[in-house]
């Protein structure tokens, strides 16, 4: 999901 990607990005 996009949310998971954002969290992993940070």
From Swiss-Prot:
Phenylalanine amide found at: 10
Name assigned to this protein: Myosuppressin
Subcellular location, principal: secreted
Family per similarity comment: Belongs to the myosuppressin family.
GO cellular component terms attached to this protein's record: extracellular region
Keyword Metal-binding: no
Recorded superkingdom: Eukaryota
UniProt keywords, alphabetically: Amidation, Neuropeptide, Secreted
UniProt subcellular location: Secreted
GO biological process: neuropeptide signaling pathway
Expression (tissue specificity): In larvae, both myosuppressin and myosuppressin(2-10) are expressed in the CNS but not the midgut, thoracic perisympathetic organs (tPSO) and abdominal perisympathetic organs (aPSO). Myosuppressin is expressed in the ring gland (at protein level). In adults, myosuppressin is expressed in brain, cardiaca, corpora allata and thoracic-abdominal ganglion (at protein level).
């Amino acid at each position: 999901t996009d949310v998971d990607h954002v969290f992993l990005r940070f």
